[in-house]
């Protein structure tokens, strides 16, 4: 895994591999390195690159709101910079939604999408969520948690122990959790480490969840939604709604929650590779 960052360009990580190009878009708060196990499995068959979302590299303070189309355009910019012709997209959570937005904007660039527990909400749910966020931007429970999260730890081990006790990570292995800790925290003098993806940016992403129905309808490439059977983001009703919008959308489920690609990276990789192979 090699990291690349140049002025004026979207930063990315190379995970190696040969063959067709695959670009990965990560979830809110989880840098590409968090998914090392998953992406190394994919790199056994494809040339894999993880694109960093704007909260990891922007020098600007997090705004209250920012359209997710901005992250989609960043993804498109990185793909164009790479010189790749037609690529596969894999994304998790907001990264999967950003991938869908990107593919709906420039369909000729993409061979297919694997969306791992993507953020998809119906138009009605989106309306009420957006209204509440506009009226009380810091009142949403998920926003409150993001703004309250600690940003400093004595060292990486202290950060690991903190997260190890959190319910959200209870089905994530120690090794994958450490991948997240190392990817999401940077040293700042001595051993002390600082959170790279600030709570303010995380909250901005949560407040700005987009309406997705139009993008789903406009998809031209095949897409597989891989949902966790214990996901608190995707319900059976939502999956039925999404798959009913476009005949190119398939749905499958795996054992796990919203952090499915961290909880079951091997299973996610196998499903993704099978889908890619069947759509070549």
Task: Please identify what each model-predicted range represents.
Residues 85-128:
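Conserved hydrolase catalytic core segment
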Residues 49, 53-90, 129-131, 270:
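Active-site loop/oxyanion-hole signature of alpha/beta-hydrolase fold enzymes
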Residues 14-61:
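Conserved HGGG/HGGXW glycine-rich cap/lid loop of the alpha/beta-hydrolase fold
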Residues 23-27, 92, 227:
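The conserved beta1-alpha1 loop
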Residues 6-15:
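A short loop-to-beta-strand scaffold at the N-terminal edge of the catalytic core in hydrolase folds
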Residues 175, 184-244:
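Conserved serine/cysteine hydrolase catalytic core
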Residues 111-152:
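Flexible "cap/lid" loop of the alpha/beta hydrolase fold
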Residues 256-265, 269:
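Catalytic histidine-centered segment of alpha/beta-hydrolase-like enzymes
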